[in-house]
A protein has these predicted regions:
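Alpha-helix capping/helix-boundary segments
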Residues: 75-77, 103, 185
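AMP-binding/adenylate-forming catalytic core of the ANL superfamily
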Residues: 182, 187-188, 209-290, 299
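Short Gly/Pro-enriched turn/cap motifs at secondary-structure boundaries
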Residues: 148-153, 202-204
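Thr-Gly-centered strand-to-loop micro-motif
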Residues: 23-24, 48-49, 98-99, 162, ...
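Conserved AMP-binding/adenylation subdomain of ANL enzymes
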Residues: 3-20, 28-69, 154
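Conserved ATP/PPi-binding loop(s) of AMP-dependent carboxylate-activating enzymes
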Residues: 152-156, 167-199, 237
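Gly/Ser/Thr-rich phosphate-binding loop
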Residues: 67-72, 81-146, 158
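Flexible lysine-rich "adenylation lid" loop at the C-terminal edge of ANL adenylation domains
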Residues: 285-286, 291, 297-317
Length: 317
């Protein structure tokens, strides 16, 4: 599965022996490891560094060693936007990739438009650790006309959606669980030494746990996660859709909660804005404001791969 995914990534990103990546992501993160595997298996090279994108040394190394490819998660790209993406002088970079979460379309559009002027190809991607990192990609030429799409399956992979009864959904814009098949799917999880005797449990098929739909051109869109829901007064609310509502209003957000309580964390310092957001969300999802708690924070707790640490949110109420 590691070899298969490395080859597929190398193919759609056109990685050659002339390419050089930099360790912008942790090795123990599947996306970060896939960057290393795909470049080395193609005869390319890797620049090793412990510096982050917020450090001057990181960008110095990119130019010093003529790095051609840069990978990041949404948090990394939010940092790049804060630094001023239009001011970045990185002439050797030919392609930049993003996975590991969802960026708002406004941010993706700003990034892709700016990078296009610098002759840098920007790829938005989707993946799962259980599929050795990457499942689909959205080519740069489709970024602006397929807003929010995760694209199509990587080479040698296949995507489809099923309803809750496991039946194939073949109608456009109908939501179901996203299913993937390919040689890059792992065998399963070994929680004990005895599990190693079970063999290939997944048999090349991965139920992602994400809800998705596809359009008339066969491009897929994530609509939420099967386990990212809370029940508020009997209504099933998608936490991902709540985050999407606030992101589209221009604010970074993280949503969690429990039965009859929706907890939303937003990066801002305006109490009036908190009340306005609570009112807007209440109107959009049809839930009484008393069930909505909005917490203004300066930053989100994050895991070492840059993703939001949802378990840590309750510690900053």
């Amino acid at each position: 599965n590691l070899v298969s995914n490395a080859k597929s990534i190398s193919k759609y990103l056109a990685i050659t022996s002339d390419d050089r990546a930099i360790t912008s992501l942790p090795f123990n993160y599947s996306y970060g490891l896939s960057v290393i595997n795909s470049h080395l298996s193609s005869g390319g090279s890797i620049v090793l560094t412990n510096s982050s994108m917020m450090e001057r040394d990181f960008w110095h190394l990119i130019n010093k060693h003529s790095v051609t490819s840069l990978a990041g998660v949404p948090y990394n790209y939010e940092m790049i936007l804060r630094l001023g993406i239009d001011r970045l002088e990185i002439p050797s970079i030919k392609k930049m990739t993003q996975a590991g979460g969802k960026l708002s379309f406004d941010k993706i559009k700003k990034i892709s438009t700016t990078l296009q002027k610098k002759n840098i190809r920007f790829y938005s991607m989707y993946g799962q650790t259980e599929a050795t990192a990457r499942i689909s990609y959205l080519p740069p030429e489709n970024i602006n006309n397929k807003p929010g799409s995760i694209g199509k399956a990587i080479p040698n992979g296949k995507l489809w959606i099923e309803n809750k009864d496991g039946e194939l959904i073949d109608q456009i814009d109908s939501v179901g669980e996203l299913i993937y098949s390919g040689e890059n799917v792992s065998m399963g999880y070994a929680k004990s030494i005895n599990d190693l005797e079970l063999g290939d449990m997944n048999k090349g098929i991965l139920r992602t746990g994400d809800l998705a739909k596809f359009d008339s051109d066969g491009y897929y869109y994530i609509e939420g996660s099967t386990n990212r829901f809370v029940k508020i007064f009997g209504n099933r609310i998608s936490l991902d859709s709540i985050e999407e509502i606030i992101i589209n209003k221009g604010f970074e957000s993280a949503a969690t909660g429990y039965d009859d309580k929706l907890l939303i964390y937003v990066i801002h310092n305006n109490n009036l804005l908190t009340d306005l957001l609570r009112s807007d969300i209440s109107a959009e999802i049809g839930i009484n404001q008393t069930a909505i708690q909005i917490n203004a924070v300066s930053e989100f707790p994050r895991l070492n791969n840059g993703k939001i640490n949802y378990n840590g949110l309750t510690n900053i109420q």
